[in-house]
Amino acid sequence: MRTSRSPVRSRLAPLFTGVAALAALLVAAPAAHAADPPLRDLAAAKGKAIGTAVTGSKLTGTYGEIAGREFNWLTPGNAMKWGSVEPTRGAFDWTEADRIVDFAEAHDQDVRGHTLVWHSQNPSWLDNGTWTPAQLSQLMNDHIALEVGRYKGRLAAWDVVNEPFNEDGTYRQTLWYNGLGTDYIAQALTAARAADPAAKLYINDYNVEGVNAKSTALYNLVRDLKARGVPIDGVGLQAHLILGQVPSTLQQNIQRFADLGVDVAITELDIRMQLPATEAKLAQQRTEYDAVVKACVAVTRCTAVTVWGFTDSDSWIPDTFPGQGAATPYDENYAPKPAYHGIVTALGGTVTEPPVPAGCSAAYSVANQWNTGFTGNVTIRCAAGSSLSSWRVTWTFGAGQQIGQAWNASCTQTGATVSCANASWNGGVSSGGSVSFGFNGTWSGSNPVPTVTLG
């Protein structure tokens, strides 16, 4: 889990360059609109949920309208963490958490409680105290009983234990692990089940989206907990991802957890990029949001995808990774970005693309071919009287071809479908002009020329 960010006007000045560039891109492009039907209806038709992390104090105006319309799950970004609800021992503040739960109930939404046992954002009195194992166990169990019990019957799921592992798959050295050993996890799950038998109980972590040492440690933990009869209903894959680094084993990993007999949720999805954003980066981000959501849709026991804040104005990324951002489906002015439309298409919806000017077209050719490799070229041309300020082309290979390195364009391939968008320097195609890009690829058996769509 990651914290929600501070208001946008408090951000460091250098980041405004990237924000302004992104705004210019979105203003210059034809107007984009939210889906009709909204995301929550598209997800429901697939038997899934689509959620967002929210800040309770912002659930008014446009922010509240989008949160209520588009999503059927809400996760409190910070409001239910121990440091928020009990900053002083024995003194509780449920204002923000209650506001989110009340909003969700008014908008027919489920709530994912986040989070009960974590190494971060604990109250200082807890972190700085000296506790015996018995005292620490009692504190943890009492906290879980109090918070889960307060919302009994009102929350659908809880992230009971958050981020228990290091990157190499060893247990993170935390207050809980150091005081109670690995058994703190089973204790926490058991206490949560006792406090609300109907709520689904999850272990949640980051960098566990693909098959790796950390996700395998989580897999082994869940397998062992189930073998011991400890209540565990699901795993949360946070999915704080970097543009161009979506794990190729994401769907395989989701499936292996599902095969253990637990649900899987993508709980904190965002895909960050180096600022400034460009049309090419936004197009690639759209493809990657589409791929992540499709991986969940493909696995029956993957129940939900939650984005970690739906708007760039409420994202934790810029304050944590200076110079990076544009990670969410909506821009800072609440306009849906290409990433939003990637979610739409992954959920089976349709997107009305801006019309390509008459007289502009794209042509594919094979410039060179050898053994199992080839070089492909694509040329975008506009006849006299037509022009483009940016472009994106797609095609579907018919014989298993794969693209490799590309130049003068940003290209991604998902299955047989390839999407390429202009680089920062060649988006404009003037009246009567053309631009070209190329790539190396592989083939086997045959290498037919696909039909290219410009749009």
Would you name each region that the model predicts?
Residues 1-34:
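Secretory targeting and sorting signals
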Residues 72-78, 162, 195-205, 218-247, ...:
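Aromatic- and acid-rich polysaccharide-binding/catalytic face
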Residues 53-64, 82-95, 165-170, 208-217, ...:
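Acidic-and-aromatic substrate-binding clefts and catalytic sites of carbohydrate-active enzymes
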Residues 349-455:
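Extracellular low-complexity, O-glycosylation-prone Ser/Thr/Pro/Gly-rich "stalks"
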Residues 39-40, 69-88, 95-210, 272:
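Substrate-binding cleft and catalytic face of glycoside hydrolase catalytic domains
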Residues 115, 200-208, 239-240, 257-289, ...:
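Active-site clefts of carbohydrate-active enzymes
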Residues 35-77:
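Boundary/entry segment of secreted carbohydrate-active catalytic domains
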Residues 55-70, 137-147, 213-225, 250, ...:
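Short, acidic/polar
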